[in-house]
Amino acid sequence: MSYNESSQIKYWMFNNEGLKKLREQCNNQHKQVILEKTPSSEPNILSPDDELSLIHYYETKTLEIAMALNLPDKVSAPAIIYIKRFYLKNSIMQYGAKLVMLSCLFIACKTEDNHLDIDYYSNITKASPSDITNLEIIILESLNFNLIVYHPFRPMYGYILDINDNSAIYNNTNGVSPIKFDTLWETCKKSIQKSLFSDCCFEFHPQIIALACLNLNWDGFNMYCINNNNNNNNNNNNNNNNNNNNNNNNNNNNNNNNNNNNNNNNNNNNNNNNNNNNNNNNNLLL
């Protein structure tokens, strides 16, 4: 399935106002539950901003745990985005962020086929296996079972590979720093990780986020865009020329066919006339 047909673009893209509205709705719904159950006139209730601050804290902890366990970016990125999506439909006052974080990271490991032993994971994170797994169904239902996440790491890797393959163009340009694949990748990766702690994943497509991070970290970005634009224009011109050539060939073939048909028709008419003349001559002889 392509990104344009994915559940991410269909169900998980919002603007600022939409995100704010969803978070306020979740907060208000659980606030009413607390007020009904708490006799105190002034119960401790978190505001939407308070909840967002706590969620942000546990998103950063997710990355720390993933790095401690040597989990790849393809696991940590979906885990963080699962947490974000979960708390668009649920309040942190209803489901504690620590266990949600641990469950989301464990789900991401399974989704990305990166095996993680539950007992080992439980021992490292100081949470019981049942605490980690009990929330799985609740989280999956809140995510609508939309587990495939398109994150900026993949397009970024592709961009840097393309830059590296054409490094001779950029390395010989004044004002552009020499390209070292590993250095540029690690620098851009840190920017992507920071973007995961914001709402970028809800508001922008992953390839756009990747380009923005590349622009922040590489002074040859503008030249890269111009070069790609020129290549695209050349490809379009070549395609147009090929189409024109094909059209000309088709027209020539059609003209040749029409000429052949006309010649055949003329020959047939001549043959018919000759036959008629012969018949007339025969009639005269009779």
From Swiss-Prot:
Taxonomic superkingdom: Eukaryota
Keywords: Cell cycle, Cyclin, Nucleus, Transcription, Transcription regulation
GO molecular function terms listed in the Swiss-Prot or TrEMBL record: cyclin-dependent protein serine/threonine kinase regulator activity
Compartments (UniProt record): Nucleus
Biological-process GO terms, alphabetical: regulation of transcription by RNA polymerase II; transcription initiation at RNA polymerase II promoter
Database matches in Pfam families: Cyclin_C_2, Cyclin_N
Disordered: region residues: 235-286
InterPro entries: Cyclin-like_dom (IPR013763), Cyclin-like_sf (IPR036915), Cyclin/Ssn8 (IPR043198), Cyclin_C_2 (IPR031658), Cyclin_N (IPR006671)
Domain Cyclin N-terminal per the UniProt entry, residue ranges: 79-148
Function: May regulate cdk7 involved in transcription regulation and cell cycle progression.
Family: Belongs to the cyclin family. Cyclin C subfamily.
Protein name in the entry: Putative cyclin-H
Source organism (scientific name): Dictyostelium discoideum (Social amoeba)
The encoding gene: cycH
